[in-house]
């Protein structure tokens, strides 16, 4: 996907942080959109509160922050409720499954995604949404590799991300730097076209989203922007070798049309949600 640049100026690394200044000095009318930020969670009690606190408030017509929780056994859901954000429980396993549910139940026009581990620059959410609107885009994915901070992607993780992104470029011919990024900004309406709905319930959903965005939306509507990436807070749920191998296999399966959908699109009516008042106590 192209162009690849930071939110302000592709010639300056420091300008990636101008989103903070944008929020601080933003005194005009609110952006005329409603926004849902989706955080998939499983045992993120250490990082969830600072992740939520880092998301700016008051810059759009309505901001919904929601976790889609995969049966956390720590205080993740309790912390979310203390922070007065929406909690949607999804007991079907998988990173992709959490997002395929969250995309369906999100209430607002624009969706922003990121991990609940303090790695992504939550302070840039308003800047990225404004970029989506100003440039009449449908989808933004955020490249972590160009501006990754020291210690944020050590050893095999950095090599694995590079190898998977290189493979995706070769197989699909799309100029994307970071096929595994989990920070995206897009219009919920893209899913009105069923061809844009991802099928994978696991980690490969991340690369699938970018493949579909370029294929369905086109290079003028789907772009990649570089953002800072920071060391995570808390223990990672990802399994480096196992998830890497699944991502690699999925790229080839997608390329030849052998991928398959294991679960239906969207949430189940039985999924507990804090807005419905039927969320069970934390396990």
Regions found by a protein language model. Name each.
Residues 1-32, 173-174, 197-283:
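Hydrophobic helical membrane-anchoring modules
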């Amino acid at each position: 996907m192209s162009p690849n640049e930071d939110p302000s100026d592709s010639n300056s690394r420091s300008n990636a942080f101008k989103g903070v200044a944008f929020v601080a000095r933003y005194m005009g009318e609110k952006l005329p959109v409603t926004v849902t930020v989706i955080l998939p969670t499983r045992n993120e009690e250490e990082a969830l509160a600072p992740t939520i606190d880092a998301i700016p408030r008051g810059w759009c017509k309505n901001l919904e922050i929601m976790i889609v929780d995969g049966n956390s056994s720590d205080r993740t859901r309790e912390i979310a409720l203390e922070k007065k954000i929406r909690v949607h429980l999804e007991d079907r396993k998988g990173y992709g499954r959490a997002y395929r549910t969250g995309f369906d139940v999100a209430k607002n026009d624009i969706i922003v995604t990121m991990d609940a581990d303090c790695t992504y620059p939550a302070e840039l959410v308003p800047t990225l949404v404004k970029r989506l609107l100003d440039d009449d885009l449908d989808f933004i994915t955020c490249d972590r590799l160009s501006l990754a901070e020291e210690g944020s992607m050590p050893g095999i993780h950095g090599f694995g991300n590079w190898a998977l992104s290189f493979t995706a470029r070769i197989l699909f011919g799309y100029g994307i730097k970071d096929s595994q990024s989990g920070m995206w900004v897009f219009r919920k309406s893209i899913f009105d076209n069923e061809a844009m709905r991802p099928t994978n319930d696991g980690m490969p959903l991340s690369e699938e989203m970018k493949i579909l965005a370029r294929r369905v939306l086109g290079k003028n509507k789907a772009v990649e922007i570089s953002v800072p990436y920071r060391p995570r807070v808390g223990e990672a749920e990802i399994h480096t070798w196992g998830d890497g191998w699944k991502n690699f296999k999925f790229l080839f399966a997608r390329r030849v049309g052998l991928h398959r959908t294991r679960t239906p699109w969207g949430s189940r009516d039985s999924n507990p949600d804090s807005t419905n008042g039927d969320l069970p106590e934390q396990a």
